[in-house]
């Protein structure tokens, strides 16, 4: 199988983002968004997925982290989709259930080409790492749309916002590792013969 690599960059009046991703990597990451908690989460995602990820962002953090995280998710999704290519010979679907101390999160992905987010967040506290909890919904929504994946995230239980979000990123990494696993087939994993 050819190297599954993608790169994407974007510059707006709010952010400047550059991403390089190798799906069949070793889980090495170099992340610098200017928002330390996001860097930590993205490092976890890369590690648990087994992706090599280089990502930089300069955003208007003096306003808040919204533009930064939204644009990071858009660019990450675009680079990931590029790396996947035609999605021939992959498992396509992956899931994971991950605890983090008192918190538990379930994540299921389908690399179907049809973007959708289901996000059950009832237990999330209103503020996580100094930002409103809705910031993470926007991140995952933007990622699902740009990567063209069906993404279900269920925060099952927990109290600590850091632990809950960390469990989600670890579970997403594991689910993506499983969904992108290559099994040697020359077929697209769909009865209709294409994923779009």
Swiss-Prot record:
Keyword Lipoprotein belongs to the record: no
Keywords: Amino-acid biosynthesis, Cytoplasm, Histidine biosynthesis, Lyase
Enzyme class: lyase
GO biological-process terms attached to the record: L-histidine biosynthetic process
Keyword DNA repair among record annotations: no
Any Pfam family matching the protein: IGPD
SUPFAM superfamilies, alphabetized: Ribosomal protein S5 domain 2-like
Principal place of residence: cytoplasm
GO annotations of cellular component type: cytoplasm
Molecular function GO labels: imidazoleglycerol-phosphate dehydratase activity
Subcellular location per the Swiss-Prot or TrEMBL entry: Cytoplasm
Pathway: Amino-acid biosynthesis; L-histidine biosynthesis; L-histidine from 5-phospho-alpha-D-ribose 1-diphosphate: step 6/9
EC number: 4.2.1.19
Catalytic reactions on record: D-erythro-1-(imidazol-4-yl)glycerol 3-phosphate = 3-(imidazol-4-yl)-2-oxopropyl phosphate + H2O
Assigned protein family: Belongs to the imidazoleglycerol-phosphate dehydratase family.
Designated name of the protein: Imidazoleglycerol-phosphate dehydratase
Gene name per UniProt: hisB
């Amino acid at each position: 199988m050819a190297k599954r690599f993608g790169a994407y960059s974007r510059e707006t009046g709010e952010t400047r983002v550059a991403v390089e991703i190798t799906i069949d990597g070793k889980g090495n990451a170099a992340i610098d968004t200017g928002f330390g908690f996001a860097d930590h989460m993205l490092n976890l995602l890369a590690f648990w997925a087994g992706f090599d990820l280089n990502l930089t962002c300069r955003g208007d953090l003096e306003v808040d982290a919204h533009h930064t995280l939204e644009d990071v998710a858009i660019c990450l999704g675009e680079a990931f989709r590029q790396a996947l290519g035609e999605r021939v010979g992959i498992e396509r679907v992956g899931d994971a259930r991950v605890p983090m101390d008192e918190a538990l999160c379930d994540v299921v992905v389908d690399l179907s080409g049809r973007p959708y987010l289901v996000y059950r967040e009832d237990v999330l506290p209103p503020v996580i790492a100094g930002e409103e909890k809705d910031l993470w919904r926007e991140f995952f929504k933007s990622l699902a749309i740009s990567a063209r994946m069906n993404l279900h995230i269920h925060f099952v239980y927990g109290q600590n916002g850091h632990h809950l979000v960390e469990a989600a990123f670890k579970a997403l990494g594991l689910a993506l590792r499983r969904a992108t696993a290559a099994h040697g087939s020359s077929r697209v994993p769909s009865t209709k013969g294409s994923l779009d």
